[in-house]
């Protein structure tokens, strides 16, 4: 019996769901705003908020925990050098989810998930290489 309904499954296996949220976390950290379906945005928010809290801690163990989850060292650098210091005085609530109408084709409810005090220049077509806190390009 399917008791509880604690988490949404999105019609995917556990591994696929974990990879999907890791990829969405990477996109959100890189662009600071993404458009996705409303249920995915609602489930993504606590995942990324925990990553930002790790970025605020800033120690080696927190960095290794973040690398284990999002698997991109350049984005972990942005998380710890840019996002962590940006939200050092804020206790949670780093993200907002805004409803964005319905998708053409299947009428799925869409949402925009973004950082609260986001950098509007971070969003773009590809936004190029990831920049560190000083604005220089990271060596990959």
From Swiss-Prot:
GO molecular function, one term: structural constituent of ribosome
Name of the featured protein: Large ribosomal subunit protein bL17
PROSITE patterns reported for this sequence: RIBOSOMAL_L17
Subunit note: Part of the 50S ribosomal subunit. Contacts protein L32.
Record-linked SUPFAM superfamilies: Prokaryotic ribosomal protein L17
One GO term (biological process): translation
Stored NCBIfam families: L17
Family: Belongs to the bacterial ribosomal protein bL17 family.
Keywords carried by this UniProt record: Ribonucleoprotein, Ribosomal protein
Entry's Gene Ontology cellular component terms: cytosolic large ribosomal subunit
């Amino acid at each position: 019996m399917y008791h509880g309904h604690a988490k949404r499954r999105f019609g995917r296996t556990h591994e696929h769901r974990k990879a999907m949220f890791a990829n969405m976390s990477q996109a959100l950290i890189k662009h600071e705003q993404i458009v996705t379906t409303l249920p995915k945005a609602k489930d993504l928010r606590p995942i990324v908020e925990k990553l930002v809290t790790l970025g605020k801690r800033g120690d080696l163990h927190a960095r290794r925990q973040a690398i284990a989850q999002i698997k991109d060292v350049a984005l972990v650098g942005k998380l710890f050098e840019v996002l962590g210091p940006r939200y050092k005085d804020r206790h949670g609530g780093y993200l907002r989810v805004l409803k964005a109408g319905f998708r053409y084709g299947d009428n799925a409810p869409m949402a925009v998930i973004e950082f609260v005090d986001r950098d509007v220049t971070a969003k773009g077509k590809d936004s190029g290489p990831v920049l560190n806190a000083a604005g220089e390009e990271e060596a990959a």
